[in-house]
């Protein structure tokens, strides 16, 4: 008998069943990586552009003369403005508006406040005084002394 761990026969690992996985999407190259310079020279590029305009016009009109249609559209809708020369100063994006006029005074002489002491308050305000009973805005020293004496 062998009681040592080293002498025991090792059991094999239990294989796990494979998990279903979603296939990876194919790698799509970016558009900037697929661009290459044109293979035509300048007259060939101009010819291809003219034919593309002619065929796009033929997609909605059967007259075959897209140049006259472009001229009619330009006359009817207005031509685009001419480009500014390079290095010209940029015009201001938003023009400054003049200040708004002062609002009209809707109540030049407001009536007195309705309620108790309203008539006196209105008269006091008109005479340069403040307060609900037409008196002074700030209490005098005598009023404060009387108030503190009543508190004691």
Swiss-Prot record:
In this chain, the stretch annotated as Disordered covers 1-28, 75-152
State where composition is biased (Pro residues): 15-26, 80-92
- Protein name from the UniProt record: Uncharacterized ORF2 protein
Q: Where are the compositionally biased (Basic residues) regions? A: 1-13
Where is there biased composition of kind Acidic residues? 133-152
């Amino acid at each position: 008998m062998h009681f040592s761990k080293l002498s025991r026969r090792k059991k094999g690992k239990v294989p796990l069943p494979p998990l279903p996985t979603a296939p990876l999407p194919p790698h799509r190259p970016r558009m900037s990586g697929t661009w290459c310079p044109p293979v035509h020279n300048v007259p060939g590029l101009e010819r291809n552009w003219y034919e593309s305009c002619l065929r796009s016009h033929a997609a909605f009109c059967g007259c075959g003369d897209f140049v006259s249609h472009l001229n009619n559209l330009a006359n009817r809708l207005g031509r685009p403005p001419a480009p500014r020369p390079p290095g010209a100063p940029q015009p201001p994006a938003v023009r400054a508006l003049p200040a708004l006029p002062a609002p009209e005074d809707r109540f030049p002489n407001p009536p007195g406040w309705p309620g108790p002491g309203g008539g006196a308050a209105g008269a006091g305000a008109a005479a340069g005084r403040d307060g609900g009973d037409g008196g002074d805005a700030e209490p005098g020293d005598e009023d404060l002394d009387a108030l503190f004496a009543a508190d004691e």
